[in-house]
Amino acid sequence: MFNQNSPIISVEQLNKEIANHRILHRISFSVYPGEIVGIIGHSGSGKSTLLRCLDFLIEPTSGSISIAGFHTSSPIEKISRTAFAKRVAYVSQSCGLFLAKTVFENIAYPLKIRCPEMTKALIEEKVDDVLHFFNLYERKHAYPSRLSGGQKQKVAIAIAIVSDPRVLLCDEITSALDPRSTEDVVDKLSQLNEERGITQVFVSHEIEIVKKLCCQTLVMHQGSIEESGPTEQLFLNPQSAITEELFHMQSIAKGIYEHGENEEILRLGFPKGLAVQGMISQLIQSGGISINILSGDIHLFRKTPLGFLIVALSGGKEQRDWAKSSLREKGVIVKQFQKSR
């Protein structure tokens, strides 16, 4: 059992170069037991390379990685893959199933390889357990060719977790799935975290999934961490233009309204229960400003609803500054969008 107060993953000043080309640069972060951490970024930003470093598939040029008790202080080729795979599991979008084996045989295979002392009865018990968890028990004797894309991906995750790992690394595992299958897989990943306490690192370009699943998120750009923090804070108050672009917020505001000289476009973020509409009414009644609500929505972050409004704030500069300050004092996250050029 790992100490809940100590990181189960610790990365310090990680660098990776291939043929004198910098892939990763000074990457540092920690993941604590039970967290689901997302990694987002444009194609080529280094997300998958970082995940492969965490899985000890490639050795960093410099820096250190500690994951589930394994450390890069030892050359990775000297680390037992069998022992490593019992604690750290890796799933990619390709699934990697044996086509000539049934669903049951695919899931049982790693147990037979990694745990030769395990009895046939115990193997069957563990495989049946994950089959029931993923609602695949009725498909246990089916071959991969008879499965849907979503079912194949769930089998791949079942293979990864049947050995009871402490960490699950997921690389774009929903990218080839239809929306219904994606939702099913994401729900199972969340359930794995809640019921079995499996720490997860989730690489994805699908922002809605990251918002739903991940408590913390790393934003990568050109091999470096551009920004990191609680996922909802990155969404509500991004500090980086890259983060803002990935969450599509600047384009949303520009597409809604082109503001005038004495107007500002604001994005107001607020948790459930904060009566932001009443606050806006009070500000308008105070005089000197007008607030036009342009759009609004509710987003779920790990089942916690957070809302936002995009508004046009009009009035003199002093009155606008007072209105923004008043909203912030009441707990509203205020994000100002730059005027289009």
Curated annotation (Swiss-Prot):
ABC transporter domain mapped to chain residues: 9-247
Q: Which major enzyme category is it?
A: translocase
Q: What's its catalytic activity? A: L-methionine(out) + ATP + H2O = L-methionine(in) + ADP + phosphate + H(+); D-methionine(out) + ATP + H2O = D-methionine(in) + ADP + phosphate + H(+)
Where does this protein come from, organism-wise?
A: Chlamydia abortus (strain DSM 27085 / S26/3) (Chlamydophila abortus)
The UniProt similarity line reads: Belongs to the ABC transporter superfamily. Methionine importer (TC 3.A.1.24) family.
Top-rank taxon of the source lineage equals Bacteria
Q: Which InterPro entries match?
A: AAA+_ATPase, ABC_transporter-like_ATP-bd, ABC_transporter-like_CS, ACT-like_dom_sf, MetN_ABC_transporter-like, NIL_domain, P-loop_NTPase
The task this protein performs is described as: Part of the ABC transporter complex MetNIQ involved in methionine import. Responsible for energy coupling to the transport system.
Q: Which GO terms describe its molecular function?
A: ABC-type D-methionine transporter activity; ATP binding; ATP hydrolysis activity
Gene3D superfamilies from the entry? 3.30.70.260, P-loop containing nucleotide triphosphate hydrolases
EC number of the protein: 7.4.2.11
Q: Which Pfam families match?
A: ABC_tran, NIL
What is its quaternary makeup?
Answer: The complex is composed of two ATP-binding proteins (MetN), two transmembrane proteins (MetI) and a solute-binding protein (MetQ).
List UniProt keywords, sorted A-Z: Amino-acid transport, ATP-binding, Cell inner membrane, Cell membrane, Membrane, Nucleotide-binding, Translocase, Transport
SUPFAM superfamilies, alphabetically? ACT-like (SSF55021), P-loop containing nucleoside triphosphate hydrolases (SSF52540)
Q: Where in the cell is it found?
A: Cell inner membrane
Q: What is this protein called?
A: Methionine import ATP-binding protein MetN
